[in-house]
């Protein structure tokens, strides 16, 4: 591990024996830098611009080389605002890619894309750093075992189970509960698996990032008294940051997660909220770098950029990175190139439905649209598979009958269909669950439901043993015993 030139002691002069260039052109967040002949920096090298603006304020901007243009010029993308920069300013080639602090020192802290702490809690130990650009693990290092990653959330574990070391997409428009679901998962993983999480906030609202941090402190995921006991490291490149920062902050978070996996040999959860913003930042920069746009104005390198991030998220023989990525779907159009490219990399999809959120069923996970490659009898077992299929069939039949019910009413249905509808409505409500992180809003304590309990509960509903209970008894409860207890009080 090398000393990090971008975050090391600012008192040390970095100009000695360094490759010096000068700014030749500035186009928004993109800089052209001229270097002496034969002294061109490598692609992805970090460049640092230091100087003073017209008001005498100090400027310190880090950039990343993207293209070698010829005529001894390189084109670089700035990781922070370029206000105050002017032509002719000195630029230092650091000789290495951006490097960020990794290891236990990162837990409980908030970082920016450069690995600098932004939480006003003092400096971070930067003796152990790692470059953000790496190749994916070799095939021989990969772990091919298939195992389920239990989340304690009924609808997820039963109908679209997550794979340990897999990639999961959380799909949904604005305001259907993606961020709350992510927070619940961080909470459950910390408590049930004792694992660490890394949260990458890519191009989302700063307010939400702040709320998440405050709620993590309240729920104990971040331990203020002893930061080393915290379960999560946070890396933010929010909406107000330049596209360079939003484009690379996902890699910064991933680099921190890789260290926990490869060196500490831990199981890690990597959250990316939102992967769409990673693509969006790439498309903002792409045109300025002089690339021809492709479909819908996205960058022509869309699938390559996505692949270079996603292929590093995997399980090795040492540990695993399970990644949960919120995917904003522009205008709810799943065929848009950004979500469509993301789909290719995912093992499971959790689709959030506005219709369920409107009914007050939270988490608003759509049981019919959510999918998982893990839902196979040879992986999850015959009992789990059969229960999940029966639940889906019951809900699908209810969906088909809804038009008839809306026009003619329940009375026109056959006895069998009426029973199916009654059970489907119970299942729909039983798929809801009180969350630990939502206790503050709902007042009801959160529930973690193990997979065996979940399967037992749905089997009882499907068998007809609970047909006599009112459907309200199944709403926002944990396991099936709580539903029967609630029914006696109704």
From Swiss-Prot:
Annotated positions of the Phosphothreonine modification: 6
Keywords: ATP synthesis, ATP-binding, CF(1), Chloroplast, Hydrogen ion transport, Ion transport, Membrane, Nucleotide-binding, Phosphoprotein, Plastid, Thylakoid, Translocase, Transport
Assigned EC number: 7.1.2.2
GO biological process: proton motive force-driven mitochondrial ATP synthesis
Disulfide bridge partners, by residue number: none
Cell location: Plastid, Chloroplast thylakoid membrane
Record keyword rRNA processing present: no
SUPFAM superfamilies for this protein: C-terminal domain of alpha and beta subunits of F1 ATP synthase (SSF47917), N-terminal domain of alpha and beta subunits of F1 ATP synthase (SSF50615), P-loop containing nucleoside triphosphate hydrolases (SSF52540)
Keyword Manganese: no
PANTHER family recorded: ATP SYNTHASE, ATP SYNTHASE SUBUNIT BETA, MITOCHONDRIAL
Assembly and interaction partners: F-type ATPases have 2 components, CF(1) - the catalytic core - and CF(0) - the membrane proton channel. CF(1) has five subunits: alpha(3), beta(3), gamma(1), delta(1), epsilon(1). CF(0) has four main subunits: a(1), b(1), b'(1) and c(9-12).
Described function: Produces ATP from ADP in the presence of a proton gradient across the membrane. The catalytic sites are hosted primarily by the beta subunits.
Protein name as annotated: ATP synthase subunit beta, chloroplastic
Organism per entry: Aethionema grandiflorum
């Amino acid at each position: 591990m090398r000393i990090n030139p971008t975050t090391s002691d600012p008192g040390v002069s970095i100009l000695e024996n360094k490759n010096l260039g000068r700014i030749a052109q500035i186009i928004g967040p993109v800089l052209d830098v001229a270097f002496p002949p034969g002294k061109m920096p490598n692609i992805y090298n970090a460049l640092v611009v230091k100087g003073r603006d017209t008001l005498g304020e100090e400027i310190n901007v880090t950039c990343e080389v993207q293209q070698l243009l010829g005529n001894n010029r390189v084109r670089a993308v700035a990781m922070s605002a370029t206000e105050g920069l002017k032509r002719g300013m000195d630029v230092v080639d650091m000789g290495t890619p951006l490097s960020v602090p990794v290891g236990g020192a990162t837990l409980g802290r908030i970082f920016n894309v450069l690995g600098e702490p932004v939480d006003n809690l003092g400096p971070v130990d930067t003796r152990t750093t790692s470059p953000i650009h790496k190749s994916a693990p070799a095939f021989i290092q990969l772990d091919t075992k298939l195992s389920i990653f239990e989340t304690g959330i009924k609808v997820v574990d039963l109908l679209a189970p997550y794979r340990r070391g897999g990639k999961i997409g959380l799909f949904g428009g604005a305001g259907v509960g993606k961020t709350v679901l992510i927070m619940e998962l961080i909470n459950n993983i910390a408590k049930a698996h004792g694992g660490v999480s890394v949260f990458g906030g890519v191009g989302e609202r700063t307010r939400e990032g702040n709320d998440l941090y405050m709620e993590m402190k309240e729920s104990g995921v971040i331990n203020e008294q002893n930061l080393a006991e915290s379960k999560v490291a946070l890396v933010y490149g929010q909406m107000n940051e330049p596209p360079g920062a939003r484009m690379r902050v996902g890699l910064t978070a991933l680099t921190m997660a890789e260290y926990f996996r490869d060196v500490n040999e831990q199981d890690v959860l990597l959250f990316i909220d939102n992967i769409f913003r990673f693509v969006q930042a790439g498309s903002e920069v792409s045109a300025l770098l002089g690339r021809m746009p492709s479909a819908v104005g996205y960058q022509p390198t869309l699938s390559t950029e996505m692949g270079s991030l996603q292929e590093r998220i995997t399980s090795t023989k040492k540990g695993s990175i399970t990644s949960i990525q919120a995917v904003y779907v522009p205008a709810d159009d799943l065929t848009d190139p950004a979500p469509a490219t993301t789909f290719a990399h995912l093992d499971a999809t959790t689709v959030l439905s506005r219709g369920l959120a409107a009914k007050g069923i939270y988490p608003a996970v759509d049981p019919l649209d959510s999918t998982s490659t893990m839902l196979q009898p040879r992986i999850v077992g015959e009992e789990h598979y059969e229960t999940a299929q029966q639940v889906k069939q019951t809900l699908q039949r209810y969906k088909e009958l809804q038009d008839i019910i809306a026009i003619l009413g329940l009375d026109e249905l056959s006895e069998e269909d009426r029973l199916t509808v009654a059970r489907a409505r119970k299942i729909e409500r039983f798929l809801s669950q009180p969350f630990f992180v939502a206790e503050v809003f709902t007042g009801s304590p959160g529930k973690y439901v193990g997979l065996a309990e979940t399967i037992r509960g749905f089997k009882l509903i499907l068998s007809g043993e609970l047909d006599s209970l009112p459907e309200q008894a199944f709403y926002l409860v944990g396991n099936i015993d709580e539903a029967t207890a609630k029914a006696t009080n109704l």
